[in-house]
């Protein structure tokens, strides 16, 4: 009898434990369920590792705000493919959509299918604040490209530079030319005659830069528009024996650029703080969903008051700039003086 009672008691305890375990798992599953489902669609090809920082930022924003964000991009960087991805996003009825304005004219029709369904829209990275407003976005998060180019050009002008080569690895993106134009107008020269459509193959970029500099020996400076053009240009300058002699600046950042800043090949990198372009739009859409508001002022207040967001900024040494409607992620400048701090998180969060 005692054995039977013990067995019965054990069965009861086992059943109770199973129920408690099931309840705990159910509670965890409920807690883990995301509050919203967003998508970020970029123009970047798979080969562009610069976007890894943005992908990492998306993951951290998802964690901090308990949401899920898909990342989509055209594998080869084809804008027509990007347009189709946007149309697919509209059809899937996401809780929010984030897009780059790689080509306003090509993408506006696809983006209109998102806003026609009253799906909250944020634009990032490429494009202008004016284009963002025309598309019906809540806000734009990015770096004003012309302003950034001009700021870099003013530094070049102060160094006595009067001529330059703009190495454009993404000429299919109209916004990319704003960087060249801003730099050129700071110097007082024509950007069209100074811009090289270099393509994205590293060997081709290196070859084209070398050929241009041989054919234009009076060129005093080089401006690269990102790692895909900067890294091969570094090799070209070193191979030609002019590294450190030719004034050289670039947009964006990676470990090769960091080394070139440290050894004097590159004067500075124009930092658009890409982490902010991944984190902030996800955070904004989460606030829109939770607080039922599209008011930029209220969204900014909620964002700035969020301790998890502030902790991320402090850890990675980031500083957004806030406008009346939009949030700026740059430009900042990475030089010999601050490159070591940035390098600590390069390729991951900087």
Predicted regions and their residues:
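Structural motif
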Residues: 69-95, 194-216, 230-232
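Extracytoplasmic "Venus flytrap"
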Residues: 37-65, 70-86, 94, 100-104, ...
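Hydrophobic alpha-helical
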Residues: 99-116, 183, 198-260
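Short, solvent-exposed amphipathic alpha-helices that sit
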Residues: 49-64, 148-152, 174-191, 208, ...
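Flexible loop/hinge segments that line or gate small-molecule binding clefts
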Residues: 68, 105-147, 161, 254-262, ...
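Periplasmic-binding protein-like
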Residues: 40-42, 93-101, 120-124, 165-168, ...
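Hinge/cleft segment of the Venus flytrap/periplasmic-binding protein
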Residues: 34, 186-187, 284-350
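Hydrophobic alpha-helical segments within soluble ligand-binding/sensing domains
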Residues: 82, 139-164, 205-206, 253-257, ...
């Amino acid at each position: 009898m005692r054995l039977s009672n013990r067995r019965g008691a054990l069965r009861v305890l086992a059943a109770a434990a199973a129920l408690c375990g099931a309840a705990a798992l159910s509670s965890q599953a409920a807690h883990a369920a995301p509050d919203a489902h967003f998508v970020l669609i970029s123009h970047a090809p798979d080969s562009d590792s610069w976007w890894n920082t943005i992908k990492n930022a998306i993951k951290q924003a998802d964690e901090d705000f308990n949401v899920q964000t898909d990342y989509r991009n055209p594998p080869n960087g084809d804008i027509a493919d990007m347009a189709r991805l946007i149309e697919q996003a509209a059809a899937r009825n996401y809780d929010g959509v984030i897009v780059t304005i790689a080509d306003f004219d090509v993408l506006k029709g696809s983006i209109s299918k998102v806003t026609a369904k009253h799906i909250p829209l944020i634009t990032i990275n490429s494009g202008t604040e004016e284009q963002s407003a025309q598309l019906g976005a809540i806000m734009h998060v990015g770096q004003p490209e012309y302003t950034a180019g001009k700021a870099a050009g003013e530094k070049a002008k102060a160094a006595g530079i009067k001529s330059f080569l703009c190495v454009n690895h993404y000429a299919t993106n109209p916004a990319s030319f704003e960087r060249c134009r801003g730099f050129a107008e700071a110097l007082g020269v024509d950007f069209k005659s100074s811009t090289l459509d270099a393509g994205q193959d590293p060997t081709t970029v290196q070859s084209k830069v070398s050929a241009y500099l041989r054919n234009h020996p009076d060129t005093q400076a080089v401006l690269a528009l990102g790692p895909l053009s900067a890294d091969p240009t570094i090799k070209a300058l070193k191979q030609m024996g002019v590294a450190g002699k030719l004034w050289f600046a670039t947009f964006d950042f990676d470990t090769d650029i960091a080394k070139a800043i440290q050894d004097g090949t590159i004067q500075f990198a124009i930092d658009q703080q890409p982490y902010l372009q991944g984190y902030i739009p996800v955070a904004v859409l989460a606030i829109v969903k939770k607080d039922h508001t599209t008011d930029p002022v209220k969204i900014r207040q909620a964002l700035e008051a969020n301790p998890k967001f502030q902790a991320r900024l402090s850890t990675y040494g980031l500083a957004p700039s806030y406008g009346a409607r939009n949030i700026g992620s740059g430009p900042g400048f990475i030089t010999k003086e601050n490159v070591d701090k940035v390098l600590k998180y390069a390729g991951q969060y900087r």
